[in-house]
A protein has these predicted regions:
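Sequence context surrounding c-type heme c attachment/ligation sites in exported
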Residues: 19-30, 112-328
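Conserved small-residue
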Residues: 25-90, 96, 107-110, 121-127, ...
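Serine/threonine-rich low-complexity intrinsically disordered regions
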Residues: 1, 38, 48, 60-63, ...
């Protein structure tokens, strides 16, 4: 009898933990900005809007490792209010000033570029910071490629493209709804940016036929104030084969999984913490190796990541398999 009671207690403790944590997490606040109906209404880009040339308050940036989204390319721009700076005190997510807009546009190279534009834009996602609260929205580009309109819900777009090996692929690309955006960007009861952490911005850029360290470049532009760090960490590119399989795999999980699989994310109850900086013995990876690779390798409701992909990422799956095999 005592053994049965102990067993029931052991089984109920995780359930009680999840219930109590759900109560403490609360709800994500409603938007405190009114999103405009058209992307052009913001005046973020000058000239032909589809060229995505940022206005004078916008700065393009690149990440060391980026989210996989059905092999789509991305253009990332941060727009800051005039005279304001991004402030960083460690290698995580910096503080962005009130009024910051982060725009990320998704596109594929046009297969038939001889008879049309070089790229086909599908969507632009906006994060707008107002009063310390981030707000998320998505805009879908029209077939004329001269405007993107605010989406109230998700949308499906049939696309054809060439993958990294030059193979023609087809899929029904899914543009996320606001609810989908929140699912990935939510940390406890707040929405936060995912990509532009200092360690992920810590990479080399190619500008004017020369190379420059991106953090130094942003400081030179006068838009980044960063405290001296005893050790400025670097998130490696998971595509860089000069890095170890371990570092590449952990970087891959940081940008593709850890926004949900961390103690503050929406998948906290899985007891996986896939952040790059988390020690291996605290991640849960060793206990859930089969489940991790199994869910990456199937499509449908069981697929991971749950949002933003309709195609298996063959290169990512191979990388994670190699990493998990190295742990055995």
């Amino acid at each position: 009898m005592k053994k049965a009671i102990i067993l029931i207690g052991v089984l109920l403790i995780p359930i009680l933990f999840i219930v109590l944590n759900n109560k403490n997490r609360g709800k994500v606040a409603a938007d405190n900005v009114i999103f405009r109906d058209k992307l052009s209404d913001y005046g973020l880009f000058k000239g032909k809007i589809a060229d995505l040339v940022p206005n004078d308050q916008g700065v393009s940036y690149e990440l060391a490792s980026s989210l996989f989204t059905d092999y789509a390319d991305k253009k990332r721009v941060i727009f800051l209010p005039k005279g304001k700076k991004i402030v960083a005190s460690d290698d995580g997510l910096p503080d962005f000033p009130d009024g910051t807009i982060i725009a990320k546009s998704f596109f594929y190279p046009n297969i038939d570029s001889l008879r049309g534009p070089k790229s086909v834009l599908l969507e632009t996602r906006l994060l707008i910071n107002k009063g310390g609260q981030w707000n998320a929205a998505t805009y879908q580009w029209n077939s004329a490629q001269d405007e993107a309109v605010l989406l109230a819900d998700s949308a499906i777009v049939p696309v054809s493209f060439l993958d990294g090996k030059g193979v023609k692929r087809q899929t029904h690309y899914i543009i996320p709804s606001r609810k989908d955006c929140i699912a990935c960007h939510r940390q406890v009861n707040r929405i936060l940016p995912i990509g532009p952490k200092i360690r992920n911005l810590n990479r080399v850029l190619y500008r004017a036929n020369d190379t420059i360290q991106q953090l130094d470049y942003l400081k030179h532009l006068g838009i980044l104030a960063i405290s001296p760090l005893r050790k400025r960490s670097l998130l490696p590119s998971y595509e860089d084969h000069n890095q170890s399989v371990e570092r590449r795999a952990r970087a891959y999980m940081e940008v593709n999984c850890a926004h949900c699989h961390n103690p503050m994310g929406t998948a906290y109850m899985t007891m996986l913490d896939l952040r790059f900086e988390s020690p291996l013995n605290e991640t849960g990876i060793l206990l859930k190796q089969a489940k991790i690779i199994g869910r990456m390798s199937v499509l449908g409701e069981m697929h991971m990541p749950q949002k933003g992909t309709t195609i298996l990422h063959a290169e990512g799956i191979t990388l994670i398999k190699d990493y998990l095999n190295s742990l055995k």
